[in-house]
Amino acid sequence: LQNLLDATNLSKSSLYKVFGSKQQLFEMAIERYSNILYKSMSAELDAKPSGLAFIHDTLLFVAREIERSEEPRGCFISNSINEWSIRDQRLKQIIIDRSETFEALFAKAIKRAQDEGDLSSENNPRELAGFLFNSISGLRASVKSKVSKQKLDKIVDITLSALH
C-alpha cells in the first residue's frame, strides 16, 4: 500500500475516496491483476509448441520463484484466497470466479495436450485442471516456505505424472 501511496502522492483517505473504499480498491486490484495475468498466460499457451509444454513451463516458472526472489510472495490470487475466503463472502466469490477462469485456461491446455496425444483422454480436462490449479497453489505455498529446489522439482515431476 505504501508504494501505491508514494507513487500517487496521495494519503490513504484520498486514495480510498478515489476508489470508493479500501474494499473496492482491493477488488479492483484483484480484477486487474487477474486480467493481466490471464492475458499473459493465454498468450503463452498459444505460443507454446504443445499444451503439455505450457503446463510443464508453468509449473517450472512457479517452482523457480525461489531463485528469482529471496522472499517469494506467491500469487496475489492464491494469497487472497487464503486470507479472505472465510471473512468476506463477496470477495470470496470474486476470487472463486477468477480462479475458475484460470482453471478454464488449464483445461484448455490439458485438452490440447490430450488432442496432441501427450496426455490420456480418459480423464475430464476440467477435473484435471482443478487438480492442476490446486497443485500450483500448493507448489506456491512450498516456494513461500523455502522448500529445497530438489523437492520443488520432484513436486513438479509428480504433478506432471499425475496428469497422465
What does each model-identified segment do?
Residues 57-65, 100-116, 135, 142-164:
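C-terminal peripheral helix-coil segments that are non-catalytic and often amphipathic
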